[in-house]
Amino acid sequence: MSSVVQVLSLQAEELHARRREMADLRRQLADKELELSTAKSELNIFERRYQNVVGPMYAELDRVKAQILGLASKFYPKAENFREEAESAREQANEFQEENRATENPTKNFNPPEILKKLFRRVAKKIHPDLASSAAERERRHVLMSKLNEAYDRLDEEAIRPILIEWEEPFLETFELGEQLVRVVSQIAQVRKRLNEILGELEDLTLTEMYQLKQNIDSAEREGHDLLQEIADVIEEKIKKAKTQIRDLAYDFIE
C-alpha cells in the first residue's frame, strides 16, 4: 500500500511541476500567436496600402506598354513576340486593376489597443488547438482559433468575447492522476512544436519581398521620407516616357 502511495505522490509532484511548465508555455504560446497574428495583419494592411497607391499606376504602365507593343507588331507583322507580349501586358494591367478594386480604402496602420492584445492572449491560452487531447477537440479548438485570429485582424473586441463563452474547457480533474500527467506531457510536446513552427513562420514572413519593402518604407517614414510616394513618382516617370514613345511610334506609323 505504501508503495502505491509513494508512486502516486511522485506522480503528483511530477504533475505539479509539469503544470507549472505548461502554464509558462501557455503564456509563451499566446504571446507568440499574438506576435504572428499582428505581423500578418500589419503586412496585410501594408499590402492593401501599397496596392492602393501603386496598383493603378502599374496597371496604366502595362496598358501603355501594350499599346507600344501593339504598334510595334504593326511595324513588324511577322514578329509574333510583339503580339504575345502586348497581350501579356494587357492581362497584367487587368490583374492590377482587379487587385486594386479588392483593396480600396486601406487602413494606413494596424494598431490594436493593449486591451485587445490582452484579450487575445487570454483567449488563446484557453482555446489553442495544441492543448487538445483528441482529434475532435483539436478540430473544435482550431475553429475557435480561426475565429479569434479573424476577429483580431478586424480589431473586433466584441467578436472575441463570445468565443470565451462558446468554449467550455474540460477539467483535468476528471482524469486519473496518471492520465492527467500523460495529457499534460503530450500538451507540452505539442506546444513546444507549435512554438518552433511560429518562429519558422515569422522568419519566413520577414524574408518576403513585401515585408522587406514594408520595413524600408516604415524606416524611411520615421526619418521623414515618403518612400512609397517616391516609388510612385518613379512609376509615373516611366508612364510619361512610355506615352512619349507611343506618340513617336504613332507619328512614324502615320508617316
Task: Pin down the residues of each PLM region.
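C-terminal accessory/regulatory regions appended to core domains
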Residues: 1-255
